[in-house]
Amino acid sequence: MKKKVLAIALVTVFTGMGVAQAADVTAQAVATWSATAKKDTTSKLVVTPLGSLAFQYAEGIKGFNSQKGLFDVAIEGDSTATAFKLTSRLITNTLTQLDTSGSTLNVGVDYNGAAVEKTGDTVMIDTANGVLGGNLSPLANGYNASNRTTAQDGFTFSIISGTTNGTTAVTDYSTLPEGIWSGDVSVQFDATWTS
């Protein structure tokens, strides 16, 4: 009888030890990329974003990170042109939360320290006034060539404002509801060849 009690006691001890051990904890996240493919080598002006934007909330700063969004610009030269101008203008910049809250975030766009706004054009190149475009300067040098010219540059994107429900503005991003916001940031580019 003592042997049976001892055996049962040992089984109970070993079973109890399993419960006391730490359990594994696993977490999973999914990253999703939007994907399309397009080729255009004949239009007079082609602007191609070189990547996507992903803003992450950082608890330590109670805000979202900023992003450098690169783009490629290709133009067809015009041998009769005497001047060239390239401008940009913000078209859309609102991200909406993917739930029923209606929360929104507005994305600000900066080009070399100048805000790209919906209300006016931001001059990127203006050869007639000596604005040669920084990283886009190959365009300023090749606008009157007989072939295509390309250059790359980037905008700085950042979250500049938000709402909790589509109307109530927040000054402290930590008060935003949890979740994911989605939408498009669109910038219009206009090129003018002057003859």
From Swiss-Prot:
Record keyword Metal-binding present: no
Superkingdom of the organism of origin: Bacteria
Chief place where the protein resides: other
Leader sequence segment: 1-22
Transmembrane segments: none
Protein location: Fimbrium
Up-regulation conditions: Negatively regulated by H-NS. Positively regulated by IHF and EcpR.
Assigned keywords, A-Z: Fimbrium, Signal
One CC-aspect GO term: pilus
InterPro entries with a match to the protein in the record: EcpA, Fimbrillin_EcpA_sf
Oligomeric and partner information: Self-associates. Forms filaments. Interacts with EcpD.
Family membership: Belongs to the EcpA/MatB fimbrillin family.
Function: Part of the ecpRABCDE operon, which encodes the E.coli common pilus (ECP). ECP is found in both commensal and pathogenic strains and plays a dual role in early-stage biofilm development and host cell recognition. Major subunit of the fimbria.
Miscellaneous note of the record: Not expressed under classical laboratory conditions, but is functional when constitutively expressed.
Protein name per UniProt: Common pilus major fimbrillin subunit EcpA
Organism for this UniProt entry: Escherichia coli (strain K12)
